[in-house]
Amino acid sequence: MMKAFLVLDNGTIFEGESFGYETESVGEIVFNTSMAGYQEILTDPSYCNQIITLTYPMIGNYGIHPDNMESSKIQASGLIVKEYVDLPSNFKSEKTLSQFLKEYKIPAIQGIDTRKLTRFIRTNGSPNGGIFVASEYSPSFLEKVKSFPGIINADLAEVVTTSSKYIFGTHTGKKFKLAVYDYGVKTNILRLLDANGFAVTVYPAKTPSEEIMKEGTDAFFLSNGPGDPAPLDYAIASTQKIMEKRYPLFGICLGHQIIGLSLGKKTEKMKFGHRGGNQPVKNLETGQVEITSQNHGFAVIDDQKQDEPISFLNLNDHTVEGILKSGYPLLTVQYHPESAPGPNDSRYLFQKFYDLVEKTKKG
C-alpha cells in the first residue's frame, strides 16, 4: 500500500496508508459514529465536500452491494479509518470497499488514530483537511488545505441535485401526487414515500414552485442535502410560496432547515454536528424517545414563538429536531426517519405525513 497523509488546517499531520484511489482531496473533516452502513454513508449526498472519519475501528468487513447505494455514486470527498479489512465476509458482497473507492476515484487512508482525531474534532470543531497519497510529506499539502473555502455560505444543493425531473416508483393506483424537491435526496427516502402510497415525482432544486403547482401536486416534500441552508434563497422563496398556498409539507434534515428559514427563523453552524445512528430524540407530543440516525452540521435556532413550537428535541444537546406551525399541515424533522443506515424507530413519520395529506384534502 502507498503511504498517505491526513493534513488538518492547523498543521496537524497524521501518517497512514492509502487503500482508496491514489489521488488527493480536500474537504471538511467530520466523524460518524455508526458501527455499520459505510456504503450508505459514503453515497449520501449530504456528505458532499466532506471527508468522513468512521469511529468504529474496523471497516470493510462485509464488502459492497448495489442495494446499499443511497445515490448513484460516492458523494464524500474521502474516507478515514483505523483499520481497513480487505477480505469481506458476506455472501452478498460483490466487491471490496477498496475497489469501490477506486471505482469512483475517492482517496482513503487507514492506520489513523481515529479516537485521537475524533476527540480533536469534538474539542475544536470540524476542521478543513485533506488526504494526500504520496511517498513523502510536502508543505504544499497544507497550502491546498488552507485554500479550501469551507462549506459555510456554499450552495452545495445545486451540486448534487438532479439535472431533470423524474418519476420514482409507480404512480399506478396512487391517491396523492407528491412533489419532491431534490437537494440531495437519499434513495431510501424515495423508497419509503413510494411504499407509503405517494405518487412520487422528483424535481431539481431550483424548479419554481409555481411550475410544479401548474403541473399538479397534492403535497410537497423537501429533501435532505449537504451544507449550509442559508444561501439557498431560491429554496426559501419556493417554500414560502408553497406555504402561502397551504400545501401539506414535509421536510427532512436540510428540508427541515429550509422550512425554518422560510418561517423567519435562523440557523447556525454546529461545532461538530450530529452524525451517527444513536441520537436520542424526544417526541414532545407523545413523550416518547426515539433513537435516530442523523447527519447534519447546521441546526435551526429556537426562537420560542408560541405558534411555531418545537415538536422534537435532541436529548444530548437540546437542539431543535422538529418544528410545527399552528393551523398548518406541516411535518419537519432534523433527523433521518428513513435510517439507511440506522434504527427504524421513526419510520412511522412517512405514514403520518400520508395521513396528514389525506386529512388536509378532505378539508
Swiss-Prot record:
Transmembrane stretches, start-end: none
Provide the alphabetized UniProt keywords.
Amino-acid biosynthesis, Arginine biosynthesis, ATP-binding, Glutamine amidotransferase, Ligase, Nucleotide-binding, Pyrimidine biosynthesis
Q: Please provide, alphabetically and separated by semicolons, the GO molecular function terms listed in this UniProt record.
A: ATP binding; carbamoyl-phosphate synthase (glutamine-hydrolyzing) activity; glutaminase activity
Which enzyme class, named as a word? ligase
Provide the Glutamine amidotransferase type-1 domain boundaries. 177-363
**SUPFAM superfamilies from the UniProt entry:** Carbamoyl phosphate synthetase, small subunit N-terminal domain, Class I glutamine amidotransferase-like
Q: What is catalyzed by this enzyme?
A: hydrogencarbonate + L-glutamine + 2 ATP + H2O = carbamoyl phosphate + L-glutamate + 2 ADP + phosphate + 2 H(+)
Q: Where is this region: CPSase?
A: 1-173
Entry's Gene Ontology BP terms: 'de novo' pyrimidine nucleobase biosynthetic process; 'de novo' UMP biosynthetic process; glutamine metabolic process; L-arginine biosynthetic process
Provide the residue positions that the database annotates as binding L-glutamine.
46, 225, 227, 254, 257, 295, 297-298
EC number per UniProt: 6.3.5.5
Quote the pathway field.
Answer: Amino-acid biosynthesis; L-arginine biosynthesis; carbamoyl phosphate from bicarbonate: step 1/1; Pyrimidine metabolism; UMP biosynthesis via de novo pathway; (S)-dihydroorotate from bicarbonate: step 1/3
Entry annotation: catalytic residues? 253, 336, 338
What domain of life does the UniProt record list for this protein's source?
Bacteria
SMART domains the record matches: CPSase_sm_chain
The protein's matches in InterPro entries, at most eight in alphabetical order, are given as: Anth_synth/Amidotransfase, CarbamoylP_synth_ssu, CarbamoylP_synth_ssu_N, CarbP_synth_ssu_N_sf, Class_I_gatase-like, CPSase_GATase1, GATASE
Explain the purpose of this protein. Small subunit of the glutamine-dependent carbamoyl phosphate synthetase (CPSase). CPSase catalyzes the formation of carbamoyl phosphate from the ammonia moiety of glutamine, carbonate, and phosphate donated by ATP, constituting the first step of 2 biosynthetic pathways, one leading to arginine and/or urea and the other to pyrimidine nucleotides. The small subunit (glutamine amidotransferase) binds and cleaves glutamine to supply the large subunit with the substrate ammonia.
Q: Which NCBIfam families match?
A: CPSaseIIsmall, PRK12838.1
Q: Into which family does the record put it? A: Belongs to the CarA family.
Fetch the PANTHER family from UniProt.
CARBAMOYL-PHOSPHATE SYNTHASE SMALL CHAIN, MULTIFUNCTIONAL TRYPTOPHAN BIOSYNTHESIS PROTEIN-RELATED
Its quaternary organisation is: Composed of two chains; the small (or glutamine) chain promotes the hydrolysis of glutamine to ammonia, which is used by the large (or ammonia) chain to synthesize carbamoyl phosphate. Tetramer of heterodimers (alpha,beta)4.
HAMAP family, per the entry:
CPSase_S_chain
Q: What is this protein called?
A: Carbamoyl phosphate synthase small chain
Native organism is: Leptospira interrogans serogroup Icterohaemorrhagiae serovar copenhageni (strain Fiocruz L1-130)
Q: Which gene encodes it?
A: carA
